[in-house]
Amino acid sequence: MSKYTFTQKNFKVFEVPGLEGRMSAIESEIQPKLAALGTYFTDFLNTHTPDEFYAHIAKHARRTVNPPKDTWVAFSTNKRGYKMLPHFQIGLYEDQVFVMFGVMHEAKNKNHYIEVFEKHFDEIENLPDDYRICTDHVKMEKPLIKDLSTDELKEALHRAHQLKKGEFFIARTLSPKAPELKTDKAFKSYLEDTFDHLLKFYS
C-alpha cells in the first residue's frame, strides 16, 4: 500500500458528489498521504535551505456548498499559514498531480518575490521541457514554458507585478497514469528532483 503516492482511487475522490461526501473522502483517502508528504518534504526543505519550513494541509474550511476540485499540502516558513509568503505546494485535481513554487496575490512584498523570478528569467526559460507556469492557483490549466515565447513569459511576470490579483508559480504536473506514480520510491524521486529545480527561485 502506498504511503505517499496518489492512486486511481485517490483521483476518483473528486467524483464524489456534495461537499460533505467529498470532504469525508478527501479526509480519509488523501489527507493521510498529504500528511506523509508534508512530514517528508518539511524535512527535505529544512535540510536544503537555511530556513525552517512548516506543512499546511488544505482544510477547505470556508466552503459551505461547492465541493473542492483540488486539494494540497503547502510548505512555508510561517507556522500559521502560507498564502502571505512564497511557498511550495504538492496537490491534485481529478486528472492531475501538481507540484509548484511561487506567490499568491495575498503575498506580502509580492513584487519583491516576482523580481526574484525576473532575475532568474534565463533559468526559467531553460528549465526542462515539462515545466510549466501557473498564473492562477485555482485553475487547472498550466501552460508549458517551452510553448511560451519570451515575450509571453515576460508578460506573465509583468501581470503578476501589476495586477492586484496577479500570481506566478513555476509548476510541474503528472497525469494519473504517469509512471512516476507507480511506486513511492519513483514518486518521491520525482518530487525531490522537482524541488531541487524549484529551489533555484527560492530567496
UniProtKB/Swiss-Prot annotation:
Protein name: UPF0637 protein Sca_0732
Pfam families membership: DUF1054
Source organism per UniProt: Staphylococcus carnosus (strain TM300)
HAMAP family: UPF0637
Sequence similarity: Belongs to the UPF0637 family.
